[in-house]
Amino acid sequence: MVSPQTRKEEELLEKQNSVFYLLTLGRKPYGSYLHIKIELDEDEKLEKEIYADNIKLENELRQLKRLYEVYQSVEIDDAQKAIQKEALLTIAKILSVFDF
């Protein structure tokens, strides 16, 4: 039996189809920075920037790119849902750097 809390979490996952995010890695004279902008809808936007040396997100970004490519080629709903969950976990790893 599925608990109400689990059901609610599943529903929230379903509604996250239209989240857009932009991740920028840059360099300034005093160090590296990572900027993220997330648009949940037209009215709700989150932006955050952190400054740090040696920001290591290359693996996560490569994994997101691979997941996106695989998602486009898969036509089976169950496989697409599994890829979506993996992509959300990878995005969560990236967001953990920002302390959201």
Swiss-Prot record:
Signal peptide range: none
Reported function: This protein may be involved in virus assembly.
Name of the molecule in the record: Uncharacterized protein A-100
Origin organism lineage: Viruses, Viruses incertae sedis, Fuselloviridae, Alphafusellovirus
